[in-house]
Regions:
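A general structural motif
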Residues: 46-51, 215-228, 244-245
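Core alpha/beta catalytic barrel or barrel-like domain that forms the active/cofactor pocket
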Residues: 149-152, 193-203, 231-240
């Protein structure tokens, strides 16, 4: 009788050991499978229209998300589109709106009164900045948006630039305070936040000379980006620049940023970088096979730390 009890206990122990090893093996297997099968890959695409091709792109390429840049869009249609997307895909993805895309910036407000960042800057009120960002976030969240490319942290642009209305102020201290409150409001409301444009948006061209040695000297108002980092922004959007590794290292090492770097819209394959979430322009939307080839050709070089950060971010959705 004692032997039977002992044997039963041993078998029970072996059973629990087996279950533990099996579960952990599956976790490892699934993690490896995610990399091998590209279940979470650092590519996002700009969406200019909704159709079945979009669903195929999301499901067949396993991109991590979309930025909705559809023209003539209102909040009701946005709600319907996102519901259709969620019904037809079986995984979490980033669904974003871009602050300075003119056709979607103000779709969740009275079109007769556009609350641009420049207006908030004129009010010089941190409480007002937080209030407006909270209202935006709650409205966007209610229709299924989970990420916003905002705010713009730069304090300078060309007078003719479309960014002019989206910049809080040329006063670095004021801009930093408003940026902090805006990011905090988005985060408090549960939106993933991507601030931009690092290191600068210059003269309507996202270009910086590769021969400049002193990185600090050309960073446009670094303290405004530090305000975004202090408010725990998830992502920083980096301009298309040569020698971009210097700026990546400066963000992580000097500015102590621990989040994710994301590119601006990519129109040329040469601008794809392995340490960032690559945002492909809507041009890539036309050919799903070309898109798959681009991802397959670049995924092997993708930074594993980036993949890990991105996976954690998407799991929170």
């Amino acid at each position: 009788m004692i032997y039977i009890v002992i044997i039963s206990i041993l078998l029970l122990i072996l059973f629990f050991i087996f279950v533990y090893l099996y579960d952990n093996f599956n976790i490892v297997l699934k993690n490896n499978e995610s990399i091998k099968n590209k279940k979470e890959i650092p590519f996002i695409i700009s969406v200019k229209n909704y159709d079945d091709n979009l669903i195929d792109i999301i499901n067949k390429t396993n991109i991590s998300g979309i930025i909705i840049n559809i023209d003539n869009l209102d909040i009701e249609n946005l709600d319907k589109i996102i519901k259709k997307i969620k019904r037809k895909i079986k995984r979490k993805i980033l669904i974003a709106i871009d602050q300075d895309y003119k056709n979607t910036y103000n779709l969740y407000y009275d079109k007769k009164f556009k609350v641009f960042s420049s207006y908030i800057g004129e009010r010089k009120s941190e409480e007002y900045a937080y209030k407006i960002a909270s209202e935006r976030a709650l409205k966007l969240k209610s229709v299924g948006i989970n990420m916003i490319l905002s705010p713009i942290c730069n304090t300078y642009c060309s007078e003719k630039s479309h960014l002019k209305e989206h910049i809080f102020s040329d006063d670095k201290i004021l801009a930093s305070n408003l940026i902090y409150q805006t990011v905090k409001a988005y985060k408090d409301s549960g939106l993933i936040t991507a601030v931009k444009y690092f290191p600068k948006y210059y003269n309507d061209e996202l270009y910086i000379d590769e021969n400049i040695e002193n990185i600090e000297s050309i960073i446009d108002n670094r303290e405004t980006f530090l305000a975004g980092i202090k408010a725990n922004t998830d992502i920083i959007v980096m301009s298309h620049i040569k020698d971009n590794y210097k700026y990546r290292d400066f963000l992580f090492n000097n500015m102590k940023f621990k989040g994710i770097i994301m590119t601006d819209y990519i129109n040329n394959d040469k601008n794809i970088i392995n340490y960032a979430v690559n945002v492909l322009s809507s041009n890539y939307y036309k050919d799903i096979n070309k898109l798959k080839n681009i991802i397959e050709n670049n995924i092997k070089e993708t930074d594993t730390v980036l993949c890990s950060k991105l996976l954690k971010l998407i799991k929170k959705l």
